């Protein structure tokens, strides 16, 4: 990919803060992501081996709640960093922005934590469909505070385009989570409580690293511009984050709707329903690793697209987003092929044969996770156009579709019905987001359409997906239908550049 966002393009006063180009960002992130994802995969296997389905289901519900409550409790303030850190940095007001948002996030987080401590029975019923998990709710409140802090630094460093630091924080988080999780499960209690504590501890450790880095470079942040009035700053931030907050709320509800339907609306007891969620969790272990790659790459892309957008290079934004979606979608489908081929070994040996229900729904879990990752990337265009509120339309329709189809299919097909409902809802959301971006000037090309259709084949088995992927490779190499000549040139130039860099190291 082209390197349009170099440090030299930034104001001179911002030079002490190192930024990474988009091409460098992708390479760095992918390199460190390999290690991080390997650690995460091994950790997930151990959790599935040691925890029974009901305990695994409890952890799944807690994690879903943390992902929902984190941005919800702070009104998604940190989501504005990707859009406005560059804006205030160029106006030499960045320290003001960070101070005010940090104080606001801390106050909102304290209020949320107090609510969890004061109403443990209510939250236990909400999360687990039973009022007797108050001890676990207390641990959740502590972990939530750490999650909010961790999200603050990840969003900030992403906005500063310091991908090395983001990848490092993610790696630290993964390593500490694995070490604490294994240690607590073996040395304290083989239950969901240990995993919740471990995750909170990992977020705390990563946040401390973020605090250390920011404190050492605080004086390099520009602040000699006139401070913006509180009304001006909060109006700008909240007009953007309000819709991002609603979008985040809907996206997280969208993600956990099927599991909440299983827990709250199935005819099974709370323990049996949580066990079904545990089976579902086992089918999502690897697919979620794949989709996390897409969402991380998508969040990394936002400030670069925003940079091009601010400079008026709208055509470049369209071309970059199309190419990004094609490459990411293809790699996710390759990952799905590998997962399907290795599924018997994964579920039979690594998971000790405990999750037959998870194996049965794995193909459709892979399918909807890929579509989820792709619409997460596509909505970057809405964010750049400051039309994040339009994304809520697609998410709301998708959420209602998910709930409606779950009501219809869950009683008849059980866990498979819940997964099919989620797959259909993700496809509909993807189509709606692409339609909305088209109204704002985004033009999806033929190659992107082909890649987005490939996940349908996953349910036919590994051989079918292999044939389709090989056909795509041949078409991309021999024609300009999937990759244009300019895109091939760009990829070859980037490959040649990195090849020279690698050779220079030897």
Which stretches of residues belong to each language-model region?
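Membrane-proximal transmembrane or re-entrant/amphipathic helices at the cytosolic face
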Residues: 2-13, 461-506
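Signature of the first transmembrane helix
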Residues: 3-7, 20-82, 113-117, 143, ...
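Membrane-water interface segments that mark the loop-to-transmembrane alpha-helix transition
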Residues: 20, 24-36, 40, 62, ...
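Transmembrane helical elements of multi-pass membrane transporters/channels
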Residues: 25-40, 173, 198-210, 214, ...
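Hydrophobic alpha-helical transmembrane segments
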Residues: 134-138, 167-219, 397-402, 415-436, ...
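Membrane-interface junctions at transmembrane-helix termini in multi-pass inner-membrane proteins
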Residues: 146-170, 363-397, 439
């Amino acid at each position: 990919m082209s390197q349009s966002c170099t440090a030299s393009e930034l104001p001179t006063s911002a030079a002490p803060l190192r930024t990474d180009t988009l091409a460098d960002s992708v390479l760095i992130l992918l390199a460190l992501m390999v290690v991080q994802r390997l650690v995460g995969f091994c950790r997930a296997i151990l959790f599935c081996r040691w925890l029974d389905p009901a305990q695994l289901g409890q952890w799944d519900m807690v994690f879903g709640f943390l992902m929902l409550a984190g941005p919800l409790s702070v009104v998604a303030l940190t989501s504005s960093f990707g859009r406005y850190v560059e804006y205030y940095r160029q106006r030499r007001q960045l320290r003001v922005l960070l101070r005010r948002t940090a104080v606001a996030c801390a106050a909102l987080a304290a209020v949320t934590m107090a609510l969890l401590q004061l109403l443990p029975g209510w939250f236990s019923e909400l999360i687990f469909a039973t009022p007797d998990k108050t001890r676990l709710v207390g641990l959740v409140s502590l972990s939530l505070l750490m999650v909010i802090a961790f999200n603050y630094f990840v969003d900030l460093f992403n906005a500063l385009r310091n991908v090395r630091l983001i990848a490092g924080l993610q790696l630290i988080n993964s390593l500490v989570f694995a070490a604490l999780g294994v240690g607590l499960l073996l040395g304290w209690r083989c239950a969901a409580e240990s995993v919740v504590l471990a995750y909170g501890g990992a977020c705390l450790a990563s946040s401390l690293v973020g605090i250390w880095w920011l404190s050492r470079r605080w004086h390099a942040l520009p602040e000699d511009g006139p401070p913006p009035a509180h009304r001006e700053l909060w109006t700008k931030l909240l007009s953007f984050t309000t819709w991002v907050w609603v979008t985040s709320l809907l996206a997280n509800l969208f993600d956990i709707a099927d599991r909440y339907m299983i827990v709250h609306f199935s005819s099974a007891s709370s323990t049996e329903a949580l066990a079904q969620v545990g089976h579902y969790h086992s089918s999502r272990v690897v697919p979620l690793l794949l989709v996390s790659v897409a969402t991380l790459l998508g969040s990394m892309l936002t400030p670069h697209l925003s940079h091009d957008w601010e400079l008026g290079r709208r055509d470049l934004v369209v071309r970059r987003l199309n190419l990004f979606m094609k490459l990411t979608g293809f790699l996710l489908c390759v990952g799905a092929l590998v997962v399907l081929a290795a599924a018997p070994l994964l579920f039979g040996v690594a998971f000790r044969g405990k999750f037959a229900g998870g194996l049965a729904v794995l193909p459709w879990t892979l399918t909807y996770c890929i579509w989820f990752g792709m619409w997460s990337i596509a909505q970057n265009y809405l964010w750049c156009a400051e039309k994040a509120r339009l994304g809520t339309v697609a998410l709301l329709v998708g959420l209602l579709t998910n709930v409606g189809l779950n009501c219809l299919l869950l009683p008849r097909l059980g866990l498979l019905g819940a997964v099919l409902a989620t797959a259909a809802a993700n496809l509909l959301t993807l189509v709606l987001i692409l339609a909305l971006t088209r109204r704002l000037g985004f033009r999806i090309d033929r190659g992107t359409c082909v890649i987005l259709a490939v996940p349908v084949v996953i349910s036919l088995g590994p051989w079918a997906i292999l044939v389709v992927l090989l056909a795509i490779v041949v078409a991309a190499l021999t024609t300009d239908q999937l990759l244009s000549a300019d895109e091939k040139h760009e990829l070859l130039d980037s490959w040649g550049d990195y090849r020279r860099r690698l050779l220079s190291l030897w």
